[in-house]
């Protein structure tokens, strides 16, 4: 398919699905289906799609997958059969999957430069969405995803889970006791959170790009133009794609883009900021290459009520608490200067329950715990930091208008154009 025909052809093919914007297609066809089990398709079959959690997720039935790399398509077919799914539909172009009536859930496992556009197109095609982190590569794309999910009545799940289950990386406890502490203001208010290796969170600066790569021929079995999609055209080099794409601004944001939403979404939840964003970003970082992601020494986010998040990139805050308020501090493993803290926490009421069963969310049309709205806000923290890195300075942000304050240079990174013919 020629590039200029992409959007028009997709909309023509997807038009038949506009009626399916309330209930999943599988449930609408339940009278002829062998079961009411929801069906799922994987868009992208790289490292994350190979994980046992995704291939082994039997609450839905995997029926399709795609990847612009033909070798990965063949690998996906083999892995699906190995995991008991039998023969599935597999292709290179994701639009073929969006046009299929037998797919209920689109699971986006691509590099982040595709997350926003695929989410919007999936919503327009009447599919529910399971998207890997970060939710989107830019704030503008995230805003558009929120609009598309709402307009089309879809259910959206962002795949980071530390606000509601499992351990909190290297912190040494779960988020729930921290939430109880914060809800009951045991630390006072406002609160500062420090995120870095000193508090148990690796910022993974190893995800940096190369600045001296020499263009190479595109492999015959790899559709590089489709892999780039909405990203600016750059000559092919294997380091720009597959397992090392995170080191380039066009596709992700290095270690901050990779791990930032995992770490910062629970912090946002603890600070009660699911419906807003920082009003100011400050940064200390070396000059950044225009193409390859580098590192930073410190990023500080400030909210309107005085709460702060500090990303410590060079371990300069040795001994710093993870959470600090006017009444107390908390370090990893729930160590604190508040006497008998664990006993106090044990007596506190439980936080409000969260909707953490995605299949139930889809069937009952109930918002998932981490959805397009609060997921957008935690992705915005990540993307504000990335904008500051690329600018080499801080800036003010309007969390209502979702733009920089009197700063066109910052807005050019917040709202980035897509490579023609791709549009949102």
Question: Which residues are covered by each model-predicted region?
Answer:
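Tryptophan-centric aromatic hotspots in well-structured domains and transmembrane helices
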Residues: 73, 112-114, 130, 143, ...
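Non-transmembrane alpha-helical segments in soluble domains
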Residues: 11, 74-77, 95-98, 107, ...
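A contiguous active-site-proximal alpha/beta segment in oxidoreductase catalytic domains
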Residues: 128, 136-221
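Rossmann-like dinucleotide-binding domain that binds NAD(P)(H)
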Residues: 215-218, 225-305
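C-terminal helical cap and adjacent loop that interface with cofactors, partners, or active-site loops
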Residues: 13-17, 238, 252-272, 296-298, ...
